[in-house]
From Swiss-Prot:
GO terms for cellular component: cytosol. GO terms for molecular function: ATP binding; ATP-dependent DNA damage sensor activity; damaged DNA binding; mismatched DNA binding. PANTHER family: DNA MISMATCH REPAIR PROTEIN MSH1, MITOCHONDRIAL (PTHR11361:SF34), DNA MISMATCH REPAIR PROTEIN MUTS FAMILY MEMBER (PTHR11361). CDD domains: ABC_MutS1. Disulfide bonds: none annotated. It comes from Thermosipho melanesiensis (strain DSM 12029 / CIP 104789 / BI429). Pfam families: MutS_I, MutS_II, MutS_III, MutS_IV, MutS_V. This is DNA mismatch repair protein MutS. This protein is involved in the repair of mismatches in DNA. It is possible that it carries out the mismatch recognition step. This protein has a weak ATPase activity. Belongs to the DNA mismatch repair MutS family. It comes from the Bacteria. ATP binds at residues 596-603. One of its GO terms (biological process) is mismatch repair. Keywords: ATP-binding, DNA damage, DNA repair, DNA-binding, Nucleotide-binding.
Amino acid sequence: MGNLEKLTPMMKQYMGIKEKYKDAILLFRLGDFYEAFFEDAEIISKVLNIVLTKRQNAPMAGIPYHALDNYLKKLVESGYKVAICEQMEDASQAKGIVKREVTRVITPGTIIEDELLSNDNNYLMAVIFDEKYVSAFIDVSTGELFLKSFDTFLEFVDFVKISSISQVICSKELFDKLKEEIPHLFVEELDEWYFQGYEEKIKETYGLFSIEHLEITELEKKVLGALFKYLEYTLMENKPPQKPKRLEGSKYMILDSKTVENLSLIPGEKGKNLFDILNKTKTSMGARLLKKWILQPLKEKKEILERQKLVEAFYNDHLLLNEVREYLSGVYDLERILTRLGYGKVSPKDLVSLKRSLYLVPSIKDALRTNENLVSFAQSLNEFNEVVGILEKALYDEPSNAPGDGNVIKGGYSVELDDYRNLLFHSEEKLKEFQESEREKTGIQKLRVGFNQVFGYYIEVPKGQVKNVPDYYIRKQTLVNSERYITQELKEFEEKIMSAREKVELIEKSLFEELKQKLSEYIDGLRNLAQKLSELDAISNLAMVARLYGYTKPKFTGGEFYVKNARHAVVERYVSDFVANDIYMDDRRRMYIVTGPNMSGKSTYIRQVGLIAVMAQIGSFVPADDAEIPIFDRVFTRMGARDDISTGKSTFLIEMSEVALILEKATKKSLVLLDEVGRGTSTFDGISIAWAMSEYIYNEIGCETMFATHFTELTELSDVYEGIKNLTIEVRETNNGVVFLHKVVEGIADRSYGIEVAQIAGVPDGVVERAKEILDIISQKSELEKKVRVLKEGQLKKIKSKKKIPEGQLSLFEVGDIE
């Protein structure tokens, strides 16, 4: 970076600040631009596609201050930490070099600026390891703060993958593991001091003498302290977030990342998903809450029924539903507005949005009170008429983006501001009024008020009228035909006009700061209201979707899973003639082996079973004519097959790792959905594993299971075990080929129709005909059927010990890292 002695004072200042923020791109304010130098300049030039120049032979690139947000978004999305260095004084007023300080460090997990955020949650997570993984994670934009612990690294990583975690901060020993496991995640290693003095940091942040009442463990204190220190470092503030909430696994159905992906629950690589189908919310808050519900279905029947009852109330009252949703469409993102208020970074437009949202609360409450099932919810919505009054009195309805130009604080709020604003905007009119007043007082009709650069404002009186000049006039200049005077009032008026712009800026900014302080007293109550409005939005949304798509209210049973004419909530939206199918499972039908050709709908059928279970437990109605559903503690899926190139794991290894997780973690109350397990290895190995796994799930776990497979040999299990049944997909053969009817019926697929599917896909006729010849030969010589018969007759050893694999057996069913 060159010899420091040869640098200008400004560049020395830059180097000193950069030394403190080595790991960040430093954007250094110079007038109307933010400049970057040296390596930072080369990076932003490349990422932002802007010109790279030089200053004192140092690479330099700059961005206009008014376009900062657009460029920041690109830098952060590209995985960079950015430090914003501002000028702390007016360059024209500075004595020597302008004072500059870093006012903000922006990382993927510490964004509060609306322009840089999507509507989704954006979590920053701190994590430590001491026998288990303990985490604290916060959405800085909404203030939500959670604590969660994990027994294994696999569980921790799984949670991170599905939970809108955009950044993880951790100790050195976890850094490498996380970067290897989730390469695209922004992970930052923290120095050891972040994890020290944590109890004092928590007390300081919340302004408490004691934190015993928070009921958090020592490890949770440690990780919270680190999180709060990091927030202070990036936001330059030590503002208290919401009190931490512990995410209790016992309250929610567990959905691992593979299940979330396989069932297409939320937006991801696969495109069409349940969230997009269900999400017709009116507010960003409601959309975020709906996504949380989908990822954390309820497990307590009482809580499910309470939510379902509210959904049903709206479902049965479409006029009320439409009215409430119309009101909600006028509610802004209060969670994020209130967080910006808490950090002192709220804008005038934010506060007007808050006011407009609060205006709607009384109307929403009145509407809800018309339905007896919603009266209690209406009572939980607190009105903030005092806040509305404060904002109505203080702010214009269409204020500027920032205070200081005189177009934010409403007229009548401050006499002093009004006076200076009147001078600034109406000085000519004021001078005319002053001139007319002086003419009336003196009787000098030709008296006029003028201005020049030497004397400023003056009163000019013709020579013939000088005798009428009052004593308080002070002579300043004698001309040939007139005399010029000033008065104390005119001098004060001049001083006001000359300083009016500066005064308007200072006073309006000061009043806006006072307003923010006054409103901050209401933040906790307003956050509770925001939470209630987001719940109202999510609940009424589920009712609207249920009416729109013809869903039915599910009943909850002790164990029977019966759904009449069940449909796949996502697929049916994109297929004009979707074929509905029944689901029927109980103790006598605990496991289904589902066979049928490719493209027949096996995978769609078993996936819709999982989707209906999830939808029911978030309190939603479900796509069916009738539904009786048990409450599941977890939904497991094992579907598809692909290599993981990034970790070097083969298809079969990944498949067996997922199978191992199911066999270890599933309980009698779980739902297991399997699709083509065993396809990643040889036919004999695949059938052996699939058979043994099916027996283990049936005998040792005893949960409800659907297993879609091309191994028709597995259908023989139904002759061995009373509770295993077979399903297949109807196919009609015609002269023109095969027609897949997508209707699920009891029975076994007589063949896979793979060659017919190949023909439909456009495989050349010669290849198709040769395939038919080979199939005839292989079918005649196969001894697999004979061997399966031996299996069925009881020659295969049964797994005897529940939840335990016999010692010495190949450790396919052990969870953990597989070398």
